[in-house]
């Protein structure tokens, strides 16, 4: 049986994300719109357009403030954000900017009872559903070779 509160909350979140995607698309330049479209269409991505726009907007805040330094991503999964950052660095000729991706390449750790989804459901249930036969996480697990190939 569907919990109506969770259902309505999920629909509201989805509508909010669609509106934000539209606003972001209207504010973006052609390169940024194309970058989000291309990134979203990579076979190895698992992010929503909303998440990709948030990543791009965060990058732009740092870039427009002329903050120098490197980009660090902790937990790269299959590397979609690393690809996104590399394309941004190339586009804006940020030759001194380096990208560092850190990951255990062992998947997501076992969630606790405090870890819940945006729909207020236990993440542990999803984790258990995706667990491999050898009792390791099958959740967001990608090898270093997969990331390098992407």
Task: For every predicted segment, state its role.
Residues 29-49, 65-150:
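S-adenosylmethionine/decaboxylated-SAM
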Residues 20-27, 50-56, 114:
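Short, functional N-terminal and low-complexity linear motifs
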Residues 2-11, 59, 76-79, 86:
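A broadly tuned "polar low-complexity/structure-edge" signature
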Residues 54-66:
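Conserved alpha-helix/loop element of class I SAM-dependent methyltransferases that forms part
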